[in-house]
Amino acid sequence: MTSKIAIVGAGPSGCFMAQSLGKACPDVEITIIEKLPVPYGLVRYGVAPDHQGTKAVIRQFARLFEKQGVNFAGNVNVGAGDAADLSLAELRDIFDVVVLATGLSEDRRLGLAGEQTGGVYGSGAVTRFWNDHPSDQALAPEFGNQVVVVGNGNVALDVVRLLAKGADDFNGSDFDPARVVTSVTDIHIVGRSPAHGAKFDAVMVKELAKIGSLDVRLDAPLCDIQEDKRLQALQDTVAAAAPNTAKTVLTFHFGWVPEALDIAHNCVRSITFRSQDGAMKTLPCDSVVTAIGFDDSRREFVGDGDGVIERGLYCAGWFKRGPRGTIPENRHDTQKVAQRIANDIADGIAKGHAKPGIAALKDRFGESIVTYDDWLAIDCTEINAAAVGRCRGKLKTVGDILKAV
């Protein structure tokens, strides 16, 4: 009897999970179920649109569906409430094993009064808007001239880079030309950690150095940077800046904690920070972008270290361990969960009457399911719609995506 496994979520965790399961227990039927009509989740909608090298992992994931027999069932919303097409209980009735790999998408908040005011944006939502995610098209952020980015990790530098680049800097990307930001003249990137505690990588700083229209500055001198490649890269970038040709000035601030937002007429006017020694600093701004991670407090299920929620129900990726780790780190995580599932299957988790798996989904939802072949048609439509200098023109609404099938 072939065990039927459903993976909920077609992002990197879900795809790595399918890869790992294919190796750990090759004689199973695997179906990846996705709420959106398109696969690849975070890779498609969360990776910066000018980082096509990172997005290239999609080619690896495509082999799951093209050569390894994994099923894709898009446009099926598993969950609770009126928006759901299928409850988790119903899904478990038709699959022997269910793995939750839906990730996290809610931006972590600063915890300041006025944070939900216009002009204060989470980096996750902004990145999804720039990546044409159907659920974030109403965001339409207005950045103005002066932007404060709160956070000092790689995502914060992604935001800075995408705000500072000009239209020609996005050649080869899938960034919609209509969404290139041209209004920003001043960016302040502010982190609560001292410089040596910053979370960004040196390669991300070096990318800033390639933006000819960007003048990079420091709010205070860096100290003892000889053993720190990240800070050396930052110092080199500051030294190489060409202020006379700069369109945008970027200033790094380290060791400042967000204290208060100044709101007037439902718009942010400034943000105040406090240092460890109690000093205060206020930065005027037209918008604030927070890049301080994702909120995992709303996770409904928590698994053990092996990703086990209960017998037959597992979790992986950020859904399992919270918003930590890179795309490659998800691969290692799913290998551990897959081995546990393989062991449980060997111990008889699927004993009893045969469950129908993907066949039951097809019977219930019919042609409303988006298959992998349907995705290939969508993919072709987007590639053919690419603007000059772009690699694709993404469809921005679920309705438009489904019309391409």
Where are these regions (language model features)?
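Glycine-rich FAD pyrophosphate-binding loop
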Residues: 26-41, 180, 192
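Conserved N-terminal/central alpha/beta ligand/cofactor-binding core
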Residues: 38-39, 43-97, 106, 115, ...
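Short acidic, glycine/serine/threonine-rich loops at helix termini
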Residues: 43-45, 87, 109-113, 159-162, ...
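Conserved Rossmann-like nucleotide-cofactor binding loop
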Residues: 13, 38, 105, 155, ...
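Glycine-rich dinucleotide-binding loop and its adjacent helix/turn
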Residues: 107-181, 302-307
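Short, conserved catalytic or adaptor-binding loops enriched in Gly and charged residues
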Residues: 60-67, 113-115, 179-181, 237-249, ...
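Rossmann-like nucleotide/phosphate-binding core characteristic of flavoprotein oxidoreductases
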Residues: 1-8, 12, 16-31, 46-50, ...
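Dinucleotide-binding/catalytic capping subdomain of oxidoreductase cores
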Residues: 157-275, 345-353
